[in-house]
Every structure is written in structure tokens, then in C-alpha cells.
């Protein structure tokens, strides 16, 4: 279901990689494709079926004979699999989409179940748009489906219309009014159109549902599906009131989220619950102080429990002395090595001007007593880039290093930005590794600015750089020069500390 959100279909290799990640994280059942939809999807289901051993695989099918046959044949290499059949049951869908009455819908559903039982005894049936289906009709079709062998009854909130107490009401009615409901598991499949997919899923658990369908990062059609990692951690953290558990390997959550984000080319919003970059970061001085004293003060989840290990305190003008001292301590400095009052005063001035401050900025303030802007050693005076049709790019630059001007050029097949970076490196000769490159549009139209953020590793330490210009190549060059100045600044601090030790 998550693939419906993507602008382009995933390759077989990418789908297999995701399936292996889901197996490693410990999902009970994974829906690996819709085999009838395309030859490529049929092939991917075949290949995944041969490689997944610890999770049960499942394929989707309409109540159409060829769909069901394709699903069964595609998964035939697996020893244990499920066929998931779906059919709309709401009056709206029956009348305007299917042009059928409810009696015909029941007949179609029963036919499909009987066909699927030729391949496996594990059948799941989704009453599409169940949340807008009359409760009488829903109870009636569910009873007949279970009678004919369906083991999992899925109740989808197909358009994300339901609120938690409504879905809870539906589940409770099924448990109370369907006499053979004990022979099946009730599942829910929620969409996030009103932002309630996770809340609805939790409400369904409390009402008696025992299978939750979702996707990692909530990827899905329109506003997305239930974010699986959010439901998982809600169950873990609030087991006291939910009274259920999962077989999930929690430490794989963060890693799995990042891999799927990368494969699907769908960035994770910073404020995304559980896996967002800000999920365990703290900017307020009061919060930072509280977290440093005891992380439970402001963190209900131990970040390491999901594979996110490092405590992240953002150094901004809202940060207090505790955060500054924490960063200095992390870099190996004792309280007696610097004056916290002077450092904090200088830090606030820099934070007001710069926005976010980094560890190497603190070092400069503490031991050189100058703002980083005053320590700019490198200044890009000129650059020119030429790219030709054979893929080669040549960059020529003039870089002022202190009082001396250097001229350098570089040719590469990796594009104009790489050509500039190589030319800069020839002059500065810092052994750096580019770890992250991000381009962000600032504004719209021809006057829009491109902001480039880069992250560099130098001598096992991270350095950040930002560049802003109307041309992204110029932004990229400025970002690298910014990084080089930060590295040079850190080197000056090291020299100063070595002198103090003599």
C-alpha cells in the first residue's frame, strides 16, 4: 500500500531490500505486492517469496478469479502465505463504483474466498470502506466470510474519515453481534486523511482488534497510512493500559525507517514522531537542563531502545549553561579549563547572530575569544565552471587564504559541484569526507535562493557548512568554504591548546 504514494515504482531489488528490513524488524505479516497489477509486481512477489523465511508473506487480490490465481501462483515458492482479498461494502461504493447491490457483493466475496482456499487456508478479507458501511451490512457479510473460511477480517478506514470512538464502536459491534467472530482475528487498516490513523488504530486495539496494518514512516496514498513505528512504540510505552505486546525488534526501528526513507526517496519530517530528527532533540534551556539531569524528565522513550543513541541538544539562544557545559564536557574539557560565565555570554551573542552554534564554535569562543566570523581564513574570490557533453566538468577558482591568493582548477566526471570541491581541496589539503549534501529552495520564481547544507567528516569529527545564493553551484561552493573555515578555526584552537600545555 505504501508504494502508491511514490512517484515511480520500486525496482525488484528495492522491494526485496525493504522486505528483508521488515523481516529483520520482526513484522508478523508483510503484504509484498499486487501480482496481477503488472509483470514486474508478479516477479517481485515471486522473488520475495523465495527469500523471506521468518515473516508470513501476503499478496493482494480483488474478488476476481485471475487476481486470486496470480497471487497464489506468485507466492507458490513459500511454505506459508496469505491471500488478502478486498471488496467494497459501503453503499456509496456499491452504488457508484461497483454498480451492484449488497446480495451480489456477498456472492462475489464468497466466490473469491472459495477460490483463494485452493491455494492457502490463510485468507484475509477487507471490507473496503468499512467505516462508511452500515453496521448491519458489515456484521452480516463478516459472519458469512468467517463461515466460509476467512481467518482475518480487516476493517479499513479507507478514506481516513473515522474518528477513534467510531472505529471502536464498529469493532465492539462485530465482537458482540457476529456469533462466529471468535474464529477470526479482527484487523484494522487506517488512513491518515484527518490525521487520526494512529489514534484510530490504538482505539481499535482497545476495542479488541489484534492486527494493525500500517507502513513504516506512514508512507501511503494521499495523506498516508498508519505509521507502524508509532503504533509499535505506543503499544510498548503504554502497555500498562493497552495490555498487548508485539514481536518487534525495537532496536531496528530507526535503522529501518532511514533505509525505507532513502529507498522511497521520501524524506522524514524533522518533527515526525519516533523517527524524526527532532524526536529526541531539545532546544529549550529548561528542557536541556532537565534531560541532562535525568532523560526521563522530558523523554518518554529511551532513544537507544529504537537504535537512536546520541543525545541531541541544539545549541541556540534558548539554551542554558547546562547545555554549553555538556558540549564542552563531551569534547573532553573540564570546568576549570574555561570561564563558563564569559563563554556563555559570548555564546548567546553568537547564537543570536548565527541561529545554531556547534561544538567547534564553542571551542573558538572559549580559547581564542573571537567569534567564528572573525576567524574566516578562506575567502572565495572567483569561480568558473564548464560542463561539456561528454560528462566532464572543469572548475577554476581563486581562493584567498589569509593574505595569499591561490589559483587552482580541477576536472571531474562527477559534475560541477564535485569539480569545485576538488579544486578547493587541492589548495586547502584537508582530508575531508562529504557525508551529507542537502539543497533547499528558499522562495519562489527567478529570485529564489538555493541553500546548500553540507556535513563533512574531518579527523573523525563532524563539521557543518551553509551556503546561500541564487545559483546552486555558488551555494555549494560557499557551503564548502564555510566548512573549510570551520575546520581551520578548529585547527587554530588545537594549536592554542598545545601552546597552553607547554
UniProtKB/Swiss-Prot annotation:
Keyword tags: Amino-acid biosynthesis, Branched-chain amino acid biosynthesis, Cytoplasm, Leucine biosynthesis, Manganese, Metal-binding, Plasmid, Transferase
Location within or outside the cell: Cytoplasm
Transmembrane segments: none
SS bonds (residue pairs): none
Region of interest (Regulatory domain), residue spans: 379-502
EC numbers on record: 2.3.3.13
Protein name: 2-isopropylmalate synthase
Source species: Buchnera aphidicola subsp. Macrosiphoniella ludovicianae
Gene transcribed to yield this protein: leuA
